[in-house]
Amino acid sequence: MKIEKMNFYSPKKYKWKGIKITEQAIEQILFLINKNPKNKGIRIGTKKSGCAGFRYTMELVKNNTIEKENKNDIVFYYNNILVYISLKEAPFLNGIKIDFVKDSINEVFKYCNPRIKTFCGCGESFSID
């Protein structure tokens, strides 16, 4: 990977608070990345969904897509995890906490954002102030 291609987010522009990833989520993300040597990191984003507007997304970034990444991405390391965030989605992700929760047979990443204004009835989508 070429470090000179990394883009750095301007904290003053959006009063960037960063993201927080819990130890449980870090362990699960590293487990998923290490399942395939082509996996190099994660992309965190949002997608239009549901009746309230958006839902959070997380996908693995493969080695062959690193060179194709948009120059409008924020790229940084978080506890040895290479993280990509689109600059246009950064305001939606500002200040989020990502956790990994095991509840009986269900295992899921949970996203906590103090700026969420409303949830849809099923809790899948949200809107932000």
From Swiss-Prot:
Superkingdom of this protein's organism: Bacteria
A Pfam family per the record: Fe-S_biosyn
A biological process term (GO) from this entry: iron-sulfur cluster assembly
Gene Ontology CC: one annotated term: cytosol
InterPro entries: Fe-S_cluster_asmbl/transfer, FeS_biogenesis, FeS_cluster_insertion, FeS_cluster_insertion_CS, HesB-like_dom_sf
MF (Gene Ontology): 2 iron, 2 sulfur cluster binding
Family: Belongs to the HesB/IscA family.
Protein name: Uncharacterized protein BUsg_114
